[in-house]
Regions:
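Non-heme iron-sulfur electron-transfer modules
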Residues: 1, 21-50, 64-86
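Immediate flanking context of iron-sulfur cluster ligation sites
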Residues: 1-6, 43-52, 205-215
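Local cysteine-cluster metal-coordination motifs and their immediate loop/turn environment
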Residues: 6-21, 49-64, 133, 161-165, ...
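Short loop/turn motifs at secondary-structure junctions
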Residues: 14, 21-23, 57, 62, ...
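Helix-enriched interaction subdomains in cytosolic or periplasmic regions
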Residues: 45-67, 171-175, 184
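Iron-sulfur-associated redox domains of electron-transfer enzymes in respiratory
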Residues: 68-279
Length: 279
């Protein structure tokens, strides 16, 4: 999350959404007179402000004074490196929103056209995060059943751990419920681990060559992918780069890609297949 006070117009939308809707009160008015601006409340660094990194302040800022960290250069570098195999996963909500900034209708901005666009941009493998969403619900379902068998030793209800913003929120605001969270990874992180293990073996690819890229709707996914415990495959982080829907649109525009001119294609197999039950 990047803050640029030189762009701030003191509209207070970030303060209102964080305080009234998210109930976190991360942002506040600081200084007086002509020096008045918006900053982290209590003059704290953002790391100590119990921010959930939900991104609501970013989406409500009308002037770009708050924005996500731009990682598009990292993706372009991976795409232009002939020694790197780029594997991208697309979240379900991204498929529903990517066409808005490109002036496309829902009928035009189909998931198959998104897959075609990513292929046209040079991604080697284009997969659907719905695949690992299926893995997540199976893991969470199994965990829940096992807890029920020993209900006297476990705490209920069991909460999902799919969203890193939600997990951060619980840890900072309701620490007494942390033990209620599922131990299952999010679909993004499951997918990253599977990409550099099962898929790499199945496709006969050296996992060290894989750059696992994730297109997600939430900036908290960037923070999640960088956590030291999210490196189970043994080849660096399970997910190397995370970009948001807005970053994806900027990349499409930078490459002068016109999605409507592309024929629709399917997501790659086998990690592009899913039941839909995990959404």
């Amino acid at each position: 999350l990047i803050s640029d006070n030189t762009k701030c117009i003191k509209c207070m939308r970030c303060i209102q959404i964080c305080d009234k809707v998210q109930s976190l009160s991360v942002w506040d008015v600081v200084n007086t007179g002509s020096r008045t601006t918006v900053n982290v409340s209590g003059n704290r660094p953002i790391e100590k402000a119990d921010c959930a990194i939900c991104g609501q302040c970013i989406t409500h800022c009308p002037v770009g004074a708050l924005r996500e960290r731009d990682d598009t250069d990292k993706v372009f570098a991976a795409l232009n490196n002939p020694d790197v195999i780029t594997v991208v996963q697309v979240a379900p909500s991204v498929r529903a929103a990517w066409g808005e900034q490109l002036g496309m209708t829902n009928e035009q901005a189909t998931e198959k056209r998104l897959a075609a666009t990513l292929k046209h941009m040079g991604f080697d493998y284009v997969f659907d995060t719905n695949f690992s969403a299926d893995l997540t619900i199976m893991e969470e379902g199994t965990e829940f059943v096992e807890k029920l068998k020993r209900r006297n030793l476990n705490k209920f209800p069991m909460f999902t751990s799919c969203c890193p913003g939600w997990v951060r929120f619980v840890k900072s605001q309701y620490p007494e419920f942390v033990d209620h969270l599922s131990t299952a990874k999010s679909p993004q992180q499951m997918f990253g681990a599977v990409t550099k293990s099962y898929f790499a073996k199945k496709a006969d690819i050296d996992p060290a060559r894989i750059c696992s890229i994730s297109i997600m709707p939430c900036v908290s996914k960037k923070e999640e992918a960088a956590l030291p415990q999210m490196a189970d495959a043994g080849y660096g982080q399970d997910v190397d780069i995370v970009i948001t829907t807005r970053e994806l649109v900027r990349m499409i525009r930078a490459e002068s890609v016109y999605p409507m001119a592309l024929d629709e294609v399917e997501f790659d197999s086998p990690l592009g297949e899913y039941s839909g039950a995990g959404v």
